[in-house]
Amino acid sequence: VYEVDAFMVNNLDPFELDQCSNSNFDLTKQTYDTFTKWTNKNETFFCAHNGYGFDYMLTSQHLFSNLHSWPWIFSTGNARQLDSLPIVQNFDFYSPNKIKFEINEKNNKIYRLGSLCKANGFEIKNLHSSRGDTEGLAKLMALLREKDPSLFRQSLSFTNKQNVLENIKAIDYFCHPETFYGRTRQFTSSYLCEHPQFKNYHLVFDLKHDPELIFQEKSNKVLEKTLNGAPKKYRTIKVGKNPFIQDKSFATKFDDEYAKLGHEVLQERANFIMKNRKEIAERICLIINDKFEEQTIDQTELIPEQMIFNLNPSSNDKTLMNKFVMTNDKDEQKRIHKNFDGPLKHLSEMILLDKYDKDGFDSKEEYRKVRKNISRRLLSTNKEVFPTIPEGMARIDTLREEKKDDKIGLEKVERINSHLEKLASEHESYL
């Protein structure tokens, strides 16, 4: 089943989508094959607006759910991932007034793709469609390149995480911007270590704080309160997400705490970090690990589709997954399905149902068992981690009230409602 708002925002008709010939699995495979064909030839830059917050993870999640054994295609080999949202935010900070913005009711700049394109003279006619958003994004990136070629090139130079890591580890201190609630500010930091819990996340010490004063504290319990008390004394750089690293000369270019300290003090603090990096990193990692152990562990059982970070298929399972994806033979996929167990069996079951319906199973009993399990989940009145039909119908009621004076919008709502009612009737027949 689907999110009602996704159909509203993207102006989609669920009845029309029912007529599409491609299964979810087939479309995912075609997308994967196209992307890997590009990256096998040359270095390929993928770009999405708010991609780090949505598109890249969603695509990887989709690949995982369709049994691709390596779903991280945007950060592998020749693939490079970019996100135009932080690039625009950094442009506005380091090269202000080069691009135009719409302003919201709180007098804040709007960074949504459609708004940016409209403000800069190339409004997306078919907003939220694949073609419309792609063309709008291409024009936005071309505008940034035109307005400040040097800054644009610099924005593309941090896509190789190994190069980023080598760079920030080798220099004494550097600058890096972060954006919170629409406001960008620059930090000046010195490298510490990799985060002990999250791969490719690296900790840096914020040099507006005096590390020598802070780390003279012998008690880790007291130190933990100091480090994590506002403002936090260390920050995180995600080296795999194109972080913008600025030369340390920028530390004093703005009227802020770093400018008041001056390069002499910043250099002294960076030297202290570099000289004592191993000991400092060990203490911080110990504090972070202890904190993670203290936190209440969420005992909620993950459904198979959520296990992209938790499921570690064996080499044999990965071989079977690859064979399942590569073959176009229904009987071969059914045979492989029987060799899976646990979450992988569930995922392959969903693919067989989506792709072949009844023909994906050896008996009517097996087919009805699968359908009954799905129907039970989708008709659940509990709060689930996936969209349910009752949840969709409740959203329809809300949208009816919101769209009561919008004839076209209300027609869309009723069209989706008719489709939901049809789905509900179909699923009820399997209970």
Where are these regions (language model features)?
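Non-catalytic terminal regions of proteins
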Residues: 213-215, 224-431
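Generic detection of long, well-ordered alpha-helical segments
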Residues: 21, 25, 53, 131-134, ...
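Acidic catalytic cores of enzymes that act on phosphate-bearing nucleotides/polynucleotides
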Residues: 157-237
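Conserved DEDDh/DEDDy metal-dependent 3′-5′ exonuclease domain
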Residues: 7-95, 251-318
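Metal-dependent phosphoesterase core characteristic of DEDDh/y 3'-5' exonuclease domains
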Residues: 1-12, 38-149, 155-158, 322-340, ...
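Conserved, well-structured beta-alpha core segment at the onset of a catalytic domain
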Residues: 41, 174-175, 430-431
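Conserved RNase H-like, two-metal-ion catalytic cores of nucleic-acid enzymes
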Residues: 1-29, 33, 37, 196-197, ...
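Amphipathic, soluble alpha/beta structural segments
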Residues: 125-166, 216-264
